[in-house]
Structure formats: C-alpha cells, structure tokens
C-alpha cells in the first residue's frame, strides 16, 4: 500500500540502499558549499529551496522527502549521517531517539532562541519538545496541525461534533455515513482515544479488548476505507459520507481552500487523557551530527524562519498547514483571509489546547496486529 504523508509507523524499518543512489557523494570534503536536508514534503519544494539557492550562488542544495519518520531515522542509523545536514521529523523523535543516539547535535541557542519570541503562544514558551532533557536546543518547530477527525458541517454541526467527540463514530445512526482515512498509526491512536484509553501508555489485558471492540466497530461500520485524502474529501463533498475518522487541518485544508468550507477538522472538547481527546503533530527540524558538517545547515534553518519563507513552507504540495512563525505579525500578514480560513486559524489555539502531543505509541506492535485483523475482516 502506498505510504502517505502522515502514515508513519512506530516500528523499526530496515534501511537499505546505496548512499550515492540519490546523487549525493558521501565522501568527506570541504562541504561549506553543500547542504542536504532529509524532510517531509514541502521543504524540498522550489518555493523553499529556490530562494535559498539564489541567496547562496554556487552552493549545491539537495532535499529528499521521506515516507515515514522511522524510515528517515534509519537512514541516519545506516550510515547516512555522513550525507545529511538537516532532518525534519515529527515532534517525539528528536528528544526520544535522535539526540540520545548522537544522530543530531545541539543548535546554537544564541542564534535560534530569539526566534521563539516571534512564534505563536503555543511555541513561544518555548516549545518543550524542542529541547533535550539537559536543556540543549535540538530542533526548531514550524509546521503543525491538530489531527483528529473531519465532518461536513452542513450535516453535522461543529458544536455537536466537538461535544460528542470520538463517540460520534460509535453512534449507530452513523453506520455507513463515514469513512476511515487509513493512516494506520493515526487510526491506532484515535481508536485508543475512542475506547477511552491513553495511546501513549502501555495497553494490555481488558484494555486490549476495549481497543479490539472499538476497532471492529469503527472499521466494520465505515462506508469507505482509503488512504487517499483527496478521495475522502471528494466523498464528503459529493454527499457519500458526512464525516471521516482520522483527519484534521492537513487533510481538510485543500478542500476548504477550494471553497468547500463545510469540510472542517474537529478536535473533541474533552477526552480520556488529562481531559484531552485530540492529537497534534508538530514538525521539528534538527541539525544532523554529520562528522563533516556544512555551515549552510544552520543558515538554511535560520532562512526558513523568515516570514516569506515560512509562508512558502505553509502553503506547498497541495496541502496547507499553519506554521509556528505566524506569531510574527509580518508572517501572519502574508496570509490572506481565504488561506487563514483554509487552515482554520479561527479555532487553532482552542484546538491546540485540547490536543495531546503526538508521541510514540507504547503498545503499537500489539495494537496494530489487532487493528490489521479487524480491517481485514
């Protein structure tokens, strides 16, 4: 099955391949005229890389888009630490995996801490997961988004969806009226929350049974199962379904930007983990601990903090996302009213306050086995 932008796994992925396959020479040399970034899509776009290349004439700037966080991590573990200068992943990996294994290195606080002052309040504190336990700055946050579920507000009001939360999909009246966007890892997290469980704590015994029951019901009563967000949005627009399980700003924004503002990402008002029922992904970009580093790495990381480049990062590749730099009035002014509406800026702060940080799912191996069996049946 084709891997999609947010369909990441929590298990180790065997890394294979030759470093030169991407056209990058791993041999040590003076590399201050080179910069290589391993990233989610967007940072590899011409709208982001083009201006940096123009600002650094003669530099060779390359980017490769990954398919999952663990896959990108395993590239570094397999020896590509000698290739990459920056890595862009979701929030738990820098502190929990990359830094403890010496795969990334601290950033210059004197250079980068002032940028937190210009970020949205949720990040200006500054954002805790950007730091190692010893206080080192290990990543800069930029793109983010609440990610729970999506409804057609012409059929299900925003207020009702937020009040009911995940229970909406357990209502017998919803049978055959919704789809499941099959981003497996996210489905597992969301089914845990639907079952009243904390997806980031160990799950066993009777709690496994709760998860199994919910997985079977959610998957069994769905009208559509697909990992294609365009197909899912189209099904909502065409009236085939009224909602879809697993989704948010990232998936709803293309349809909203095209005028279908009745398609809305929903974050439950309450949930089983400290009163929260939503989950938010936040990307961090970190400096790889390359033994032959390039000065262009931190130059690029500082470059993407600029208002116009932050806007380019937010609106690329056919999906649109908020960025932490929108706390800077100069950056916010780059977005017009339609763009702000597409990313649901009106409720972002509220949605964030109701959301848990995405973390590694503790019992993933057991839960994905249950999920997969329920999906096949």
What does each of the following model-derived ranges do?
Residues 179-183, 187-191, 199-268:
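Ligand-binding pocket segment of bilobal, Venus flytrap-like solute-binding proteins
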Residues 50, 73-84, 99-101, 168, ...:
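Short helices/loops that flank or line small-molecule/ion binding pockets
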Residues 98-106, 134-136, 254-270:
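Ligand-binding "clamshell"
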Residues 342-377:
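Conserved C-terminal helix/tail region of periplasmic/extracytoplasmic solute-binding proteins
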Residues 73, 96-144, 159-162:
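Hinge/lid segment of periplasmic solute-binding proteins
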Residues 30-97:
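Early extracytoplasmic/lumenal segment of secretory-pathway proteins
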